[in-house]
Amino acid sequence: MNLTRAGARLQVLLGHLGRPSAPTIVAQPVSGLASPASFQPEQFQYTLDNNVLTLEQRKFYEENGFLVIKNLVSDDDIQRFRAEFERICREEVKPPGIVIMRDVALAKQDYMPSDRMVSKIQDFQEDEELFRYCLLPEILKYVECFTGPNIMALHGMLINKPPDVGKKTSRHPLHQDLHYFPFRPSNLIVCAWTAMEHIDRNNGCLVVLPGTHKGTLKPHDYPKWEGGVNKMYHGIQDYDPNSPRVHLVMEKGDTVFFHPLLIHGSGRNKTQGFRKAISCHFGSSDCQCIDVSGTSQENIAREVVEMAEKKYGFQGVMDFKDTWIFRSRLVKGERINI
């Protein structure tokens, strides 16, 4: 599908929107676990009943807002994702709709088609090879524990965190992913984030604030960092700096599933290599879109719409909800609302 076809699809979508619409499992605990005898199923708020998660795993996610599944994605799949990423960076393939991003510290350098010039690609829903990640049965098996059976792939990314050149721009500020989405309820949304290599504090692993998914969506904006901030890297403006933090050390193929209200970020990449991970946000198609006007999400909504209008050549006809529905893809079950 080329951009012309994408534009045509968007026009059809906008018209539609104008009408009413009906492996080994290891969880690393960071807080005490309730015993099965003292924890009743009706207390579950963030996980759904099925035979995939153990009681201990459900309790862990309920308490902490994330769950690490070891060795979930195969080496073969990860190598295929890496190879496709490199082809995209070399401009050997140009999937329609894909967004290629560069670190702000590299933005002034002359661009040469190479994976060393790209910090992230996103919106790869039209790239058959990368989108396979969002269709992997081993991923969807766990996603369904949080979203239910009707599953939409909302947003795919492959992150290529570059070595930090001293400006600390490879950091990702602490944030909540729900800031970027107009979908509710938040409990039916989950991110799957898979390490494509060994990841630790040296190359900028994820850091999470356990239990913060139980709070509310906080105001976000660009942090005032001296070295600059990457495009759309909004951060929380008000959080408790004394909150306990957990750094997720992960091996290739390990996958963390986390709630969209969980506060998380990542540190600098202090190595000479590029730290790679692939992720997708999933949501239940039973979710509803909300109007973010007058909320703390207005700032990101403006940015997203401006980028989409520039990309597709539509001025004044799109809103925040349209941009997300346009990119979302059904991966399991039935498409209901979004």
UniProtKB/Swiss-Prot annotation:
2-oxoglutarate binds at K120, M157, H175, Q176, D177, W193, S266, R275. Its cofactor is Fe cation; L-ascorbate; ATP; Mg(2+). It catalyses: phytanoyl-CoA + 2-oxoglutarate + O2 = 2-hydroxyphytanoyl-CoA + succinate + CO2; 3-methylhexadecanoyl-CoA + 2-oxoglutarate + O2 = 2-hydroxy-3-methylhexadecanoyl-CoA + succinate + CO2; hexadecanoyl-CoA + 2-oxoglutarate + O2 = 2-hydroxyhexadecanoyl-CoA + succinate + CO2; octanoyl-CoA + 2-oxoglutarate + O2 = 2-hydroxyoctanoyl-CoA + succinate + CO2. One of its GO terms (cellular component) is peroxisome. InterPro entries: PhyH (IPR047128), Phytyl_CoA_dOase-like (IPR008775). Interacts with FKBP52. Interacts with PHYHIP. Belongs to the PhyH family. This is Phytanoyl-CoA dioxygenase, peroxisomal. It comes from Mus musculus (Mouse). The gene is Phyh.
